[in-house]
Amino acid sequence: MKNKKDFLLYYQKEYKMILDRKVDELKKEYYKKLKVIILEQVMYFIVFVLLIILFGDNSILTLLLIFLLMILFGFTLFINYKLLDNQKKDISYQINIVIYQDILSFLTNDYLYEENTQLAIEDFNKMGLFNLDILNYEGCNFTGVNIDNKRFLYCDVLLYTTREKILQDKYYDESDDILYITNYHYDEEIPIFKGLYYEMNISKKNKDYVYLIPNNFNDKFINKNIYHYISFKGNKIELENIAFNEKYQVYSFNELKSRYLLSLTLMEKINELDKLVSNKKYYVFKKDGRVGIFINDFTIDNLLKKENNWQKGISEKYLGDFFNKISYLLRINEILDEK
């Protein structure tokens, strides 16, 4: 697979010109809106000054009018500032989507990216890790990739439950000497898992489900309730690799087959993957060779929302870091597929 050095060489030769042209188009829209806002504020200021000149006495009415105009001027200035700030973030987001897709195009001609699409709930449920009967599921940034005839997909995932909350509003009526209490009911979202779902196939076929669940104090302490929402089945299996047992709990109904699947080579590959992407992960090895990896606190959305300082130009370092994060995802398939 092409690496960061190849991409930066491509950037210097061709891509810089292509990206700069796309950024310039968005810049024109931003500065056009900025000019309109500046013109509006100048007009407000001129009207403000003229009113002071025309009604420049010291009457209470005039002072009140000036005060109200000052509030109006400050309010419009604040609103316009927020509008511009939101537009800057939106432009940064749009540029990052362009960069994301251009990096995918550089790495492969066979990919699909749909920003507002999630993995079908039926396919997600088939991995059998989280219990979707009691969890709500949302997803976005669906990406399917084919590199060297190896197909895999990933998308952002949010799994959450809700609980009813009650907000009380109290009002005391002195005339009737009565305390009125109104209860407002609303649902509070409780996130259980937020991260990336990654699905691929490995050459080594499995005969039964095997689950790897993170096994350390921090995971249990921070997500002590997550086990209530995991629906995997099987018996806990102790492997001969003590270090691996300390990292992951292994569950399966077939101890012999799970030991065959989790060979020393595959465990080394999982350790290599953990070094590449340090976020905690849940692994599901299915019977047909499919593997589902749930990577906690890692999303494409966070990557796309990172501000890129487009007004001063997209730096080579920013592009290199962006490329690394995407190539790490695409290398998961390369690392984990044991021949």
Question: What are the residue ranges of the model-derived segments?
Answer:
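Transmembrane alpha-helical segments and their cytosolic interface motifs
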Residues: 31-47
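Hydrophobic alpha-helical transmembrane segments
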Residues: 53-72
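Charged, low-complexity intrinsically disordered regions
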Residues: 101, 105-108, 117-161, 186-339
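Transmembrane-cytosolic junction motif
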Residues: 31, 74-99
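Cytosolic juxtamembrane N-terminal segments of multi-pass membrane proteins
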Residues: 1-35
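Mixed-charge, low-complexity intrinsically disordered segments
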Residues: 162-188
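Short hydrophobic alpha-helical membrane-anchoring segments
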Residues: 45, 49-57, 75-82
